[in-house]
């Protein structure tokens, strides 16, 4: 089951009917009261990896493009990202106060609102040197806005994204990102579901957290004085 948000507890109806449930890409807020199996990616680690990369490249003024904060996965990506900067004495959330927060609630809205918000961001008197998109949909909106404004990545601004997309590799400056193993998520979920169907609940509730993969590509400008861009390959 793929819940719509953190507070989506409709899975209880299935459980009450005796139907085994495995949640994908989410740990529901009602987990304490209504336990359920979950298969997710290590969202916190993914956010942290991207933050470490930006810091290594000298980026201290970074904007986080949010997408539907009412979700465990998004919250963890942002938390991992923010914590890395916090440990290095930089309060990113305080920097965010310079701009109104943005939250997107649907697929279409995410792309559109990301586009509009990015336009306002680059027109501000003190724009960031890098933007962290916490999902590929918000990145699509940002890329569209950058193209419309004739902004060059990474010469004018740097991008990183949690999630990968085939389009990212075709860009003139391929997007630096963290990817999830969606095939593995599906496989683990099916294996866990079959286990429950056969009556084995010895490890219930189980949270199966899968690793993510970091792809340092060319969308981050090096402000540290070593190189002009990242030189990593996918």
What is the predicted function of each stretch?
Residues 5:
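Active-site core of PLP-dependent enzymes with the aminotransferase class I/II
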Residues 8-234:
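Bacterial carbohydrate/catabolite-sensing allosteric modules
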